[in-house]
UniProtKB/Swiss-Prot annotation:
CDD domains: F-box_AtFBL13-like. Residues 9-59 form the F-box domain. Residues 355-405 form the FBD domain. The lineage of its organism: Eukaryota, Viridiplantae, Streptophyta, Embryophyta, Tracheophyta. This is FBD-associated F-box protein At1g60410. It comes from Arabidopsis thaliana (Mouse-ear cress).
Amino acid sequence: MARTEVSGKDRLSDLPCHLLCRILSNLSTKESVRTSVLSPRWSNLWSLVSVLDLDFQDFKGEHDMGEFIDSFMEYHEELGLKLKSFNMFYDANEHLHEPFVRRLNKVVRRGVCDLNIQNMVDVDVALVRMPPSLYSCATLVNLILYCVVFDHPRSKSVSLPSVKKMYFEGVKFDGDSVLETLISHSPVLEELTVIPHPEDYLEVICVRSQSLESFRLESKRFECDNPKVEIDSPSLEFMSICDKKPESLKIHRIGPFAEVTVDVEFDVEDDDPLEISKIRKFLVGLSTFHELTISARTLESIHDYSKVGPLPPFSNLFGLDASLVESSWEVLPAFLSCCMNLDSLVIELDCVPEMEEIKLSPVPQCVLSSLDFLQLKAPSTPSKMKLATYFRKKCTRLTKMLLSGQ
């Protein structure tokens, strides 16, 4: 076969400089630098890209990485270019605080929009401290931080007018009001994820925001140290709370049709009226939701509570996704008995109950008469088919049923 002659000039190199820089911005800085050997046209393009995406493992040490950042930033400053995105995978074991703060201050002043710092070391003494300039970055839109420390700021110096997304994992806050201050001074914040450092000793996590649409909290701390949680975000469309044993969980306001995922655990003790009152308030707040995903350990806590106090009516609940993984069927009916208007039910099981268990703990009549959709996520066994048959015969309004594996 005859070989087709190829032009010495590729079409990609004919593109305007700003388009080539946009293409390079989707690569890591290391990969972007490698393109400099393609041709004279590409030799300097990587240095014009508005993104720095660095991995400490690509350098001999922090000094070399620091010199690279300084050189890149100085060149950008000479040309009057903005740095839109700064991503750093970092080893705080080799960390020098003052040079780090100085460089991060430069990044903030260059009008950064996306800031992502991942410290690979999560021990307390190696956490990276954030500079004060970060609290008043007018251009910042997305803030993603792993294993860092926020010192207590002066409230008047905090202003994050453009931030829409915050993701904090393994983060320590120097004082209960630090996180609340960051949230309250971010007027357009839409998405917030908080996974505190296991050795962070916050007593209160307070989320008050008029603009927030999505909030996820996952606590990995020891149960005796878990904080109080308060939510007041009327625009919230999605909320996920995973906290082993929160001191308290108060939900003042969220969006009327928010999808809520709850994975919490409470101690139910007959001789502790304060604990019983706390659980009651939590359940009353939970009863206002329309769509709810609930974990096995939360169902177990509700089941235990039902033995010592009445459950509130969940008349607003129309959709429920209930997990019984590593749990038993008997914990579910107590909660279902309060769901008089339930329209959609998803049950996740790792062990399908036998009919004898269901007869001892039957599905309440209010659910059998209101249910329109049912999905059973469980291993394929004869018991699963019997459970499906049970629902099909008992449910008077059921129009759709799905059977699936886990």
